[in-house]
Amino acid sequence: MSRPSKIVIASRESRLAMWQAVHVRDRLSSLNPGAEVVILGMTTKGDQILDRPLAEIGGKGLFIKELEVAMQEGKAHLAVHSMKDVPMVMPEGFVLAAISARENPRDAFVSNKYNGLDDLPAGAIVGTSSLRRESILRAKYPQLVIKSLRGNLDTRLKKLDAGEYDAIILAAAGLIRLGMENRIKSVLTAEQSLPAPGQGALGIELIDGAADMADVVAPLNDPETAHCVKAERAFSRALGGSCQVPLGGYAIIDNGQLWLRGFVATADGQEVVSAELRGNPADDEALGLQLAAELRAKGADAILEKLAHCK
């Protein structure tokens, strides 16, 4: 199969998104020395609407729609995404062709005054962008005040530094990728805050049927990460996972077994259902569906019904 002479990568224009696109560009350039690999930066609807929580404005798809249109119009060959921003059900006509090796998938505690969640006094203001983190915080730290925090990584840190929040919770991966590990006061354990499905991993999206590009990006796929993320996404998808559902799903490969943990909760954190299981990594999506079934058997449907009425 002939290799393309030019490869165009669609990306959001935030600093973190561009880091991710440059990372993929550099890898593709080294794998395809005869090709010109360029980045097409774009602003998405999710980047523009910053005054409301994601759950209110339509969720994850807001960060990828414009990139998909660019591919449909032939302006780009592929798009690079943070996997946690990719809708659980891919739009018709598009596929996830590769999932790259994962950075630290955990949540990070960031503060200028405190070293961890347990150090925060009652009434301290904590900023977060996700219902998942909000429900966890409300369940485990009811004495704290949880406020919505939108914007790109730099914007969120500026709001913290301006004193609008006593602490904020961010994905550790973004801070690490931008060389800002010094802002991390502590990394939350999976027991403290189970990560979102796909957190820390990058996904490469293509037009379905673009066999030439599928061949080009195949070397970017990390099988271990892909098994874990596929299990997490299948679990989330089976429970209607989106920005409107406080849900965590996290898998690792442990002694040759895929260990998948998951939970679903009410937004106020008062009701939480969780479970875990182990199985063959090759059965990734089946394990995700099995874990979702276990949560339903433990009462997750009642929580999902309440969430449906709250929307």
UniProtKB/Swiss-Prot annotation:
Query: What does this gene product do?
Result: Tetrapolymerization of the monopyrrole PBG into the hydroxymethylbilane pre-uroporphyrinogen in several discrete steps.
What does the further note read? The porphobilinogen subunits are added to the dipyrromethane group.
Higher taxonomy = Bacteria, Pseudomonadati, Pseudomonadota, Betaproteobacteria, Rhodocyclales
Return the CDD domains for the record: PBP2_EcHMBS_like (cd13646)
> Per the UniProt entry, what is one GO biological process?
protoporphyrinogen IX biosynthetic process
Pfam assignment, any one: Porphobil_deamC
The record ties this protein, via InterPro entries, to: HemC (IPR000860), Porphobilin_deaminase_cofac_BS (IPR022419), Porphobilin_deaminase_N (IPR022417), Porphobilinogen_deaminase_C (IPR022418), Porphobilinogen_deaminase_C_sf (IPR036803)
User: According to its UniProt record, which cofactors does this protein need?
Assistant: dipyrromethane
Q: How is the cofactor bound?
A: Binds 1 dipyrromethane group covalently.
Q: What is this protein called?
A: Porphobilinogen deaminase
Recorded E.C. number(s)? 2.5.1.61
Q: How does it assemble?
A: Monomer.
One of the record's GO cellular component terms: cytoplasm
NCBIfam families xrefs = hemC
Give, as in the UniProt entry, the pathway in which the protein acts: Porphyrin-containing compound metabolism; protoporphyrin-IX biosynthesis; coproporphyrinogen-III from 5-aminolevulinate: step 2/4
Q: Which UniProt keywords apply?
A: Porphyrin biosynthesis, Transferase
Q: Which family does it belong to?
A: Belongs to the HMBS family.
Supply the Gene3D superfamilies for this chain. Periplasmic binding protein-like II (3.40.190.10), Porphobilinogen deaminase, C-terminal domain (3.30.160.40)
Q: Which organism is it from?
A: Dechloromonas aromatica (strain RCB)
**Modified residue S-(dipyrrolylmethanemethyl)cysteine is at which positions?**
C243
Its UniProt entry gives the catalysed reaction(s) as: 4 porphobilinogen + H2O = hydroxymethylbilane + 4 NH4(+)
The organism's superkingdom is given as: Bacteria
What Gene Ontology molecular function terms does this protein carry? hydroxymethylbilane synthase activity
